[in-house]
């Protein structure tokens, strides 16, 4: 079976076409991605602007066309925090589904955390023991912990890298005042919101996933000559200082940092460090599987049952 996973996120509209079969790992076949930072198309009332909606329709239409050109059997389409939190999100979803003949669903933060956790569990296997999984997206932060394929505790907070960059950081390079204020805001938010069940996680394996963490791990490997499959909390403090002092153009020239991510990587690093500190983690392992793989695995499980 060839499945197309259409991820309508805060930074990109990303179609990943995978060959997926019961009992086998999903294998990527082709992908199509449009960079569209939806958080930049929010008006004062919190609605996505007409320009943003037009660009979104174009990106979704091109993605569906790519899926059809590659003989995709089914498109699994989902939207995360950018549309979930937009005032006109439900109307946008309705219009997209009617125009493009797909079934785009809004995932809750809890669903995001659970499906990402499932992907990490399947990647690492049962021998990894109890997992604590962290995922920083463009619009939100998800944390999940548990011993099974279904986490026993999840948390979703509006601490995504794109959202925080838009709300807190200005200048090029960013002002030291803005960076400091963002660090204090994130630390305070985590202190208030992380429940005791996640603080006292007693996990055996600490895992981070998705693009922000992969980029940070690669940068850490470049700056400190370390294994890019792991990320150390101690390195993040130095990285934040260095990255914040650079211009967007200079950050975009670093290994693994695209032009679109160059603006957000400072906020992403701040959230990563604050989250690791709040959970008392010195190091996390980077997992290549995340939400999209979790969506495919959940669909295969449903078909099997």
Q: Model-flagged regions — what are they?
A:
Residues 139-145:
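Acidic, divalent-metal-coordinating active-site segment for phosphoryl/phosphodiester hydrolysis
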Residues 1-27:
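N-terminal basic/disordered segments at the start of proteins
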Residues 3, 17, 41-72, 80-130, ...:
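Helical "lid/coupling" subdomains associated with nucleotide-phosphate turnover
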